[in-house]
Every structure is written in C-alpha cells, then in structure tokens.
C-alpha cells in the first residue's frame, strides 16, 4: 500500500497544535486586554494629572519670574539719581523713557515722605485716590518693598501696585517711595497668553485676599470679584493642593507663594475627553494586537513549532535568570552556529546581556561619583557660616558661588570676645570631597585655636608670651594669640596629615572693632585690598607660606588701620581666574577697576562683582568656586 505523504489539512498535527494554541491564547488575551484597559485608564489618568501638575508648576515659574523681574525693574527705578533727588523734570523724563523702552503696560508714581506726588509717568496724574502717605508708612515700617491691590469701581480700573522705598544716598534713610501699578486686564492678557502656550482650557489666578486677578473663562470682566468664600479658593488660600473632577473636566489646585511668602492660588483646568480618547485608542490597538498576534502565532507554530520552541524556551529561562539578577547565566542558544533568525536572536540576546552588565557597572560608577560630589557639596555648605556678625559700626557681606564640582573655597567671620572681629578667606588645594573635608578641618581648627570657642575673658597662652590683664601689651599679645591659630593649624595639618599633601592658602585678619586696627597673616593667598572712595589704598600681600605645607613655618603678622569709610575686600583665585567663552581671564586688574568704580555700593559691591563675573563667563563652564568677603567700616 502506497504511503500517503500529504495529510488532509484538518487532520494535521500542526493544525491541531495551532488551533489549541489559539484557543489557549485568545480568551486570556481578551481578559488581559480588559485588565490592561482598566490599568491603562488609571495610568493615563495619573499621567494626565502629572502633566497638568507639571504645567501648573511651569506657569508658577513664569508668574514668579515675571514678578521678580518687575520687582528688580522697580528697584532699579528707585535707585536712579533723578528719582532719589526728587528732580521733577528729570524724573518724569526718565519714567516715560523707561516705560517706552521696556514697553511697560503700567505707570510709575514718585512720592515724598509726606505722601505728596513728586513726579509720575504720562497718565499717572489721572490716577486718584492712591494712598501714597499710607503706603510710605507701611514700607518704612516693614523696611522692604510691598505689593498692594488698588481696587477700582470695575475690574478694568483695578490695579496691582508695587511700592519700593527710595533711600537717600548718604545715610540710606527712606525719603520716599516709587509706586508702579499695572492694570489687572494686563495681567489677565498675560495669563491668556500662557493659557494658549500651555494648551489648557482654563487658568484662574487669585491673590492672597481671594480677589480674582485673571480667569480665562471670562472674556469681559465686570466688577472685581472676591472668591475667598468659594470652597476651591478657600482650599488654595489655606495652602492645600489637589485634583478636582467635575462635569467632564479635571482641575489642579496649586497654592503659589509670592511676595513675602504670601499664599496666592492657581487653578488650571483641562477636559477629560482627551483621556477617554486615549483609552479608546489603547482598546483599538489592543484588539488589533490580538488579531496580529494570533496570526503570527498560528503561522509561526505551523512553520517552526518544533524547531523554534526549544531555543525560545531556553531564551525564556535566560531572560528570567537575567531578570532575577543572574547576569552570568550561560546562554547556549547558538552552540551549533545557527545562521537563522533564532541564531541571530541568540547572539543579540548575548550581546544585550553583556551590554546590560556594562551599563549597570557604569551606572554604579556614575552613581558613586554623583554621591561623592553631592556629599562634598553638602559638606561645603554645612561648614560655611549660617549668618555673619551684625555690628553697629561695621558692615559684613560674603558671596559664595560653587562650581559644578566641589572644591575647597571657604570664608568665615566671627567675634573673638566682645572686642575683636575675625575675618577668614581661604582656598584648599585640589578639588573633590577630600578638599571639601579639609576645608571643614581648616575652618574648625582656626576657630578653635583662635579661642573663638573660649569665654571672652580667657587668655590662651602662647609659648612665647604670658598674657596678663595688667600687661601694657596685653591687647597686642591677645591679638598675637588669635593669629597664632594659623601657626597651630599649619603644624597640626603638616604633622598629622602631611602624607595627604593637602594645604590651603588663606588670609586671617583680626580687627579691633573699636578703633579699626587690623592685624593679619596672609598665608600665600591672593592679595587682600583695602580701598576707599579714591581707590585701592593697600594691597595686603603674602606674609608667609601656605598653611599645612611644612611644620614650624614662619608666619609674619602685619598690621594697619581701617579708617571710617574704608573697606576690606578678600577673594579667591576663582574670581580672577574666571574664563570667558574665548578663554580670557577676568583678571586682577579688572577686579580692581570694578572695585574702584563701585565703591559707593559698600559691601553690596560683591553682588556687582558677581554680576560682572556672570557676564564675563557668559554660560561657559565655571572651573572653580567664586568666593568673596567684604568688611566696611561706617
């Protein structure tokens, strides 16, 4: 009997296996799609909430930045000579030109301490009822700028006003105010533009008193409304955030901390229709996948049911082992040098496993490096002084702008008893966590050895001096003892940690608060400047080597007097070595020119130098910390 080589299709084992696979595949797949649909709905809702929350944060950033720029611009106006001198003609000209140049959508008013209108921009004289005298007293009482809502009969007539003090040039006494007001419709237009860019359906902004500043649902505003009693607004003003679903829309309530940390409110709203449409699309894709997967499974099972099942099972075991963390699991899928897709898949799987091992190792290494940098940055910040001494006849200011990687810059200012002020600025060699830790060690040793932690009447005796209250040179010896902290710190670091080759350049000065006498040691640091209104008066150059290089080093003490109206400026090489995008150094000469030109700013001159440095660097990489300290004698 001749063997039948071709079996009927319906009787083939491949048909039976494929049919069985499809029967086993389709019901669970449909059930899985149902579960995925439910899960997807929740996830899409969560994603939509996160997206709405992110957009709210972005809007808050835009509003906050706009508010800061507005405050800075008004403060700039208040500092102009014409404004300070109450020059009516010059003030009015400046205000109009400022508004024209910046395309300002409000007006400015200048008032004296009696609340009398001195000058104003065009159109400001038409504004009646501004409580200028009351605002002057409020600003003077709080000693800072203020923001106030000036309600009108209608929303269009209501204004948001910023009040900034005007200080005299001589003694910084408040002599008047600059009032800058913006109509609420201008703010509403600004919010409307944000709405368009953010692709939202509604934005509602209320101030800390519950007044609606902007609501994009309204095209024509009537009276100024207060929604403080509204449940949603009440939640916002009580600093409560969250999501609200109502009538096919969902909203995010976000408190906003503006203007002296007062709580404003922001509500952003979107439609749920996009979420439902996305869920429907997922369902369609799911059912389409059922058909596609079913066809692929049927075809693959029919063609390679045996030839492919075993190696796929091997790959499944390998994937489970890798998922469990066994990256050394041996994959034998291609021992026979298969050239088909299974062989390629096996090679790809092996390559993927090796890549995962490499990426994990690199990620661990990068994570360790990031952790080290973050710890170093935290160490640096924790060792810097939280606050600077507040003295009647002295002004102290400091600036510390860390680079992207940690290093060893530090500064300090502390009282030695009731009569002396210690000023320190230094730079530890090298970078990284090690430099940050040694920075903390140097700073702590200087404080301890100088007697900062001792009672005010304690005299720590030096090997060369015996201090006595009756000694005519007792004051001098006490100062020598304070500065002796540099020698003690040097000997300790060089002796106990010499193998680490860590040292620091530093300037340590002790100022007699009563008469301005300065005694100091400059241990290999950048020259410290003493300047007055005529320019650089003294350069306090190095009087000894860097601290920590060699034990028993000699450190010479120099002294001079800081007269009233003079200022001490200390800095690290991160200032002079700051590079522009064209690799040009900021340089000591430019630093001295900036100091001379801006001496009248007193200790605020550091902020001017900082802005000069930011402009000079212009976005290029900052390789070193920028550290400065200023001490001005009134």
UniProtKB/Swiss-Prot annotation:
Q: Does the keyword Hydrolase apply?
A: yes
Keywords noted in UniProt: Hydrolase
Q: Where is the HAMP domain?
A: 306-361
* Entry's Gene Ontology molecular function annotations: phosphatase activity
InterPro entries named in the record: Bact_Sigma-Reg (IPR052016), HAMP_dom (IPR003660), PPM-type-like_dom_sf (IPR036457), PPM-type_phosphatase-like_dom (IPR001932)
Q: Name one Pfam family in it.
A: SpoIIE
Question: What superkingdom does the record give?
Answer: Bacteria
What GO cellular-component annotations does this UniProt entry give? membrane
Question: What is this protein called in UniProt?
Answer: Protein IcfG
